[in-house]
A protein has these predicted regions:
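Key DNA-contact positions within bacterial/archaeal DNA-binding proteins
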Residues: 49
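A short acidic, leucine-rich amphipathic alpha-helix
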Residues: 39-43
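Short, Lys/Arg-rich nucleic-acid/phosphate-binding segment
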Residues: 20, 68-74
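Short capping segments at the starts of secondary-structure elements
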Residues: 21, 32-36
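Pre-recognition alpha-helix immediately N-terminal to the DNA-recognition helix
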Residues: 24-28
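Glycine-centered, phosphate/nucleic-acid-interacting loop/turn motifs that mediate DNA/RNA or nucleotide
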Residues: 62
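Short helix-coil-helix linker/hinge
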Residues: 16-23
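Amphipathic alpha-helical dimerization/coiled-coil segments
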Residues: 1-10, 79-102
Length: 102
C-alpha cells in the first residue's frame, strides 16, 4: 500500500534538492535491473564519488537497497519505492517536462 508521505519525500529527494536529477537517473536504471556503483558511474557518465554520495542519500531514505559485500555489492530499488512507484513516475515525468521548457 502506498505511503501517504511518500510523495513529499520523493519530491524532496528528486525535485527539491541539488542532485535530484542524477538521483532520478540512478533510480531509472535500477528499475531495469541491479547495478554496482562502477556500472552506474559508467552508464550515467558520472564520477564514482558522485554516485557513492547519491546512493548514500537514496539508502538513507529507503529508496534503494543493496545485496552483497564489498566489491560485489549491487543496488536495486527498495520495496518502499516499488510500493510508491506511481508517485516516483509522476514526479519523474514532471521533471522531464520542466527540463524541456524553453
Amino acid at each position: 500500500m502506498p505511503d501517504p508521505n511518500a510523495k513529499r519525500i520523493l519530491w524532496y529527494l528528486f525535485a527539491g534538492t541539488r542532485g535530484g536529477i542524477n538521483r532520478a537517473r540512478i533510480v531509472d536504471l535500477l528499475k531495469e535491473h541491479p547495478y554496482n556503483m562502477n556500472q552506474l558511474a559508467e552508464a550515467l557518465e558520472l564520477d564514482y564519488k558522485a554516485i557513492k554520495h547519491h546512493i548514500s542519500v537514496l539508502e538513507k531514505n529507503n529508496i534503494v537497497g543493496k545485496m552483497g559485500e564489498k566489491y560485489g555489492v549491487v543496488y536495486f530499488i527498495s520495496n518502499y519505492l516499488e510500493a510508491n512507484i506511481e508517485a516516483f513516475n509522476e514526479i519523474r515525468s514532471k521533471m522531464k517536462m520542466e527540463m524541456n521548457r524553453p
